[in-house]
Amino acid sequence: MSTPQTGVRSVHSGPVIALDAMGGDHGPQEAVRGAVRAVREHGLRVVMVGRRPELVRLLAEEDAAGAIPIVHAEDALAMHEGALASWRRPRSSVAVACKLIRQGEASALVSAGSTGGVVATSTVRLRTQQGIMRPALAVSLPTRPGPTVLLDAGANADAKPEMLVQFAHLGAAYARSAFGVENPRVAMLTIGAEPGKGNRLARKTAELLTAAAAQAPQAQRLDFRGNVEGHDLLAGEVDVVVTDGFTGNVALKSVEGAVRFTMDAVAEAMTSSTAAKAGSLLQRKALRELRGRLDSDTYGGAVLLGLNGSVVISHGASRGPAVERACRLAHDLTAGGIGEEVRSRVQSGARSARRQRLGPGGEEQPAG
């Protein structure tokens, strides 16, 4: 089966992953390494989008000349560029990858580029699902019972209460589809667990979520458990944590920093003396397993929910293995029908949320 616009035959089957090969702190070299791993080790179908001459050279250096199709894109988003870049750079690698999805030539986009630029470009070119105001970045946090979905993790610095209710439906649908949680427990991230805590946005959102939990039809009902605080994110007591993108991104970066500090401190303590070094030999396997569970690269990246297409945004500092995991995540979203199932589930939830915010006369109520 040949991939459109490339002429290169693929021996693999399954969805095509459009990889933005120009995004990320480390440039196309790590993207190429990740793509080669994804194809060789997992049989994924990947098409790299970027500057063809550079990608051809890098593929040859990996002994993979001609192994992965390339779609040329002459431009690229810089890591410092934000939302306006989506308009200024219509020929960027992200924009070209979105075009492949829109034309049915790819099923998902993976990028390690600027979060603001990727979110804006994919939103403009793929459009939001019917009834969805804005997409949300969903990150799976590792906990003992199972992953907790945090959203929004950075797509929308400012949000309205109605948007956060939609994010709750998106997150619950994702938890059901991706992790098999039959009735996801949803909570609001704020400064206190007691009802009424938080700013006006948090209080109004909690009010709407409480109403949705009580009044919506059973099939569309959210299991809203109230508020959680930052120290609850890794407790595993809820399945979905909802917040605005500013708060969510700060919370995510704080968790990543705390995990990194803890792992470094443990490693330092285990090698601080001869006795500790001897003991560390026994603990090394357990430490590697713990690092693997908590490493932000383990889950591949954040999933941009709410668009007409699957988008995975990996960490800007992603190396080859992280890019490969992001490609695997994008493959699972599409091959497993997770993306379509989320879209289907959230449509009914979006309609329910809209009914919740309409008054008796069918007029929009103020956000508070």
Per-region residue spans from a language model:
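Short beta-strand segments
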Residues: 20, 49-50, 69-71, 111-113, ...
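Glycine-rich phosphate/nucleotide-binding loop
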Residues: 123-150, 237-241, 245-358, 368
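Phosphate/nucleotide-donor binding subsite
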Residues: 62-106
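Glycine-rich phosphate/diphosphate-binding loop of Rossmann-like nucleotide-binding domains
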Residues: 29-30, 42-47, 52-53, 157-226, ...
